[in-house]
């Protein structure tokens, strides 16, 4: 019994080992073509099992896919491995199958004006060497760019032309001419880009003005320019009568969320004291006086306005204005006689007065 049990165990172990080998070992009539760079396996064997599967070949398809995947994994395990950060990885070789591109082919770059002219006239570019012989220095130098041969901007002596101003700086003139050539080339490049993208560039005369700026816009621009320094305008000088701009960007200081228990206790006690106090928060006397003052100011403004309106209406009647009784004279509003309104004495030339014949108007003692 013991001998049979040992033999049965050995047979069972061999059977399990054979099943494991059968799971990872797949036999094909034709070897598969592998592209490990793309993790691709191409099976050239004819699917004979699918013909006998009937209308439901799902089981056969799953078995075929499982076998081909197993062969691909077996090939991956044969690659050299290395350890990277406590992990064993295998580096895939370069892919051999050319996959179709994801995006469409790029469009050809549009021709510039010179390229169009050269194609129309049949002009072909001539290839020139990058190095030329410089007779001045006696060595080979670049044809263009930095340290080029026959660099006229590096000469220490320039002959002044006969028709030029003898006091003109020829070195500065040559440098300015080079800057103009560079700017012209940049303008041509931008024009070519605009022509390629069908855009419109501003004219060479410059940009058109955007219009008259208001006082608020100028002030806002000046304020932005002042705070554009490294110190955010803190050490920027001000004009003698310049006003301090409002909203200069000061940060709000909030109370700490925790830690300052004394200040929090003080604020809470002050709030409770105000709520429990019997004294009203509104000063009735002060508010009443303020209201009466505003009403008096409004009435004074109305009287002043009415008096100015009356003066404008009576200005065309004559030098005396509005009068009652008596012939016109040089006085203002009066009743009877040649003088103004008087309680004693004969009528005179003055205005409202008491006693005497003094030729004056209203007089204070």
Swiss-Prot record:
<keyword id="KW-0164">Citrullination</keyword>
<feature type="modified residue" description="N-acetylmethionine">
    <location>
        <position position="1"/>
    </location>
</feature>
<feature type="region of interest" description="Disordered">
    <location>
        <begin position="233"/>
        <end position="253"/>
    </location>
</feature>
<dbReference type="GO" id="GO:0002244">
    <property type="term" value="P:hematopoietic progenitor cell differentiation"/>
</dbReference>
<feature type="compositionally biased region" description="Basic and acidic residues">
    <location>
        <begin position="235"/>
        <end position="245"/>
    </location>
</feature>
<dbReference type="GO" id="GO:0005783">
    <property type="term" value="C:endoplasmic reticulum"/>
</dbReference>
<feature type="compositionally biased region" description="Basic residues">
    <location>
        <begin position="351"/>
        <end position="365"/>
    </location>
</feature>
<protein>
    <recommendedName>
        <fullName>Ribosome biogenesis regulatory protein homolog</fullName>
    </recommendedName>
</protein>
<keyword id="KW-0690">Ribosome biogenesis</keyword>
<feature type="cross-link" description="Glycyl lysine isopeptide (Lys-Gly) (interchain with G-Cter in SUMO2)">
    <location>
        <position position="266"/>
    </location>
</feature>
<keyword id="KW-0539">Nucleus</keyword>
<dbReference type="GO" id="GO:1901796">
    <property type="term" value="P:regulation of signal transduction by p53 class mediator"/>
</dbReference>
<dbReference type="GO" id="GO:0005730">
    <property type="term" value="C:nucleolus"/>
</dbReference>
<feature type="compositionally biased region" description="Basic residues">
    <location>
        <begin position="302"/>
        <end position="325"/>
    </location>
</feature>
<keyword id="KW-0597">Phosphoprotein</keyword>
<feature type="cross-link" description="Glycyl lysine isopeptide (Lys-Gly) (interchain with G-Cter in SUMO2)">
    <location>
        <position position="226"/>
    </location>
</feature>
<dbReference type="GO" id="GO:0005654">
    <property type="term" value="C:nucleoplasm"/>
</dbReference>
<dbReference type="GO" id="GO:0008097">
    <property type="term" value="F:5S rRNA binding"/>
</dbReference>
<dbReference type="GO" id="GO:0003723">
    <property type="term" value="F:RNA binding"/>
</dbReference>
<dbReference type="GO" id="GO:0007080">
    <property type="term" value="P:mitotic metaphase chromosome alignment"/>
</dbReference>
<dbReference type="GO" id="GO:0000447">
    <property type="term" value="P:endonucleolytic cleavage in ITS1 to separate SSU-rRNA from 5.8S rRNA and LSU-rRNA from tricistronic rRNA transcript (SSU-rRNA, 5.8S rRNA, LSU-rRNA)"/>
</dbReference>
<dbReference type="GO" id="GO:1902570">
    <property type="term" value="P:protein localization to nucleolus"/>
</dbReference>
<dbReference type="Pfam" id="PF04939">
    <property type="entry name" value="RRS1"/>
</dbReference>
<dbReference type="GO" id="GO:0042273">
    <property type="term" value="P:ribosomal large subunit biogenesis"/>
</dbReference>
<feature type="modified residue" description="Phosphoserine">
    <location>
        <position position="5"/>
    </location>
</feature>
<dbReference type="GO" id="GO:0000794">
    <property type="term" value="C:condensed nuclear chromosome"/>
</dbReference>
<feature type="cross-link" description="Glycyl lysine isopeptide (Lys-Gly) (interchain with G-Cter in SUMO2)">
    <location>
        <position position="154"/>
    </location>
</feature>
<keyword id="KW-1017">Isopeptide bond</keyword>
<feature type="compositionally biased region" description="Gly residues">
    <location>
        <begin position="337"/>
        <end position="350"/>
    </location>
</feature>
<keyword id="KW-0832">Ubl conjugation</keyword>
<comment type="function">
    <text>Involved in ribosomal large subunit assembly. May regulate the localization of the 5S RNP/5S ribonucleoprotein particle to the nucleolus.</text>
</comment>
<feature type="modified residue" description="Citrulline">
    <location>
        <position position="273"/>
    </location>
</feature>
<keyword id="KW-0007">Acetylation</keyword>
<dbReference type="GO" id="GO:0000027">
    <property type="term" value="P:ribosomal large subunit assembly"/>
</dbReference>
<comment type="subunit">
    <text>Component of a hexameric 5S RNP precursor complex, composed of 5S RNA, RRS1, RPF2/BXDC1, RPL5, RPL11 and HEATR3; this complex acts as a precursor for ribosome assembly.</text>
</comment>
<feature type="region of interest" description="Disordered">
    <location>
        <begin position="280"/>
        <end position="365"/>
    </location>
</feature>
<dbReference type="GO" id="GO:0030687">
    <property type="term" value="C:preribosome, large subunit precursor"/>
</dbReference>
<dbReference type="InterPro" id="IPR007023">
    <property type="entry name" value="Ribosom_reg"/>
</dbReference>
<comment type="similarity">
    <text>Belongs to the RRS1 family.</text>
</comment>
């Amino acid at each position: 019994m013991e001998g049979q049990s040992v033999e049965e165990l050995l047979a069972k172990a061999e059977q399990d080992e054979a099943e494991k080998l059968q799971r990872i070992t797949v036999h094909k009539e034709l070897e598969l073509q592998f592209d490990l760079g793309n993790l691709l396996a191409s099976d050239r064997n004819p699917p004979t099992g699918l013909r006998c599967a009937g209308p439901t070949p799902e089981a056969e398809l799953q078995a075929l896919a499982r076998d081909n995947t197993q062969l691909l994994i077996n090939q991956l395990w044969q690659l050299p491995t290395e350890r990277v950060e406590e992990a064993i990885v295998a580096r895939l070789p370069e892919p051999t199958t050319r996959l179709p591109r994801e995006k469409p082919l790029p469009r050809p770059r549009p021709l510039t004006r010179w390229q169009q002219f050269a194609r129309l006239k049949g002009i072909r570019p001539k290839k020139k060497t990058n190095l030329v012989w410089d007779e001045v220095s006696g060595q080979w130098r670049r044809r263009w760019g930095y340290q080029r041969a026959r660099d006229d901007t590096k000469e220490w002596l320039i002959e002044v032309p006969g028709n030029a101003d003898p006091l003109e700086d020829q070195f500065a003139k040559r440098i300015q001419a080079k800057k103009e050539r560079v700017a012209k080339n940049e303008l041509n490049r931008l024009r070519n880009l605009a022509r390629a993208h069908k855009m419109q560039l501003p004219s060479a005369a410059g940009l058109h003005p955007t219009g008259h700026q208001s006082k608020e816009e100028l002030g806002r621009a000046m304020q932005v320019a002042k705070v554009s320094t490294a110190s955010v305008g803190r050490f920027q000088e001000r004009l003698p009568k310049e006003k301090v701009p409002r909203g200069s960007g000061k940060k709000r200081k909030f109370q700490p969320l925790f830690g300052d228990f004394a200040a929090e206790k003080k604020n809470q006690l002050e709030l409770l004291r105000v709520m429990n106090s019997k004294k009203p928060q509104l000063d009735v006397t002060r508010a009443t006086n303020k209201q009466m003052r505003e009403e008096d100011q409004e009435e004074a403004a109305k009287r002043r306005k009415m008096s100015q309106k009356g003066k404008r209406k009576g200005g065309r009647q004559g030098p005396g204005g509005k009068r009652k009784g008596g012939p016109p004279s040089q006085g203002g509003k009066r009743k009877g006689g040649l003088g103004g309104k008087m309680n004693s004495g004969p009528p005179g030339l003055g205005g409202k007065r008491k006693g005497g014949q003094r030729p004056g108007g209203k007089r204070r003692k």
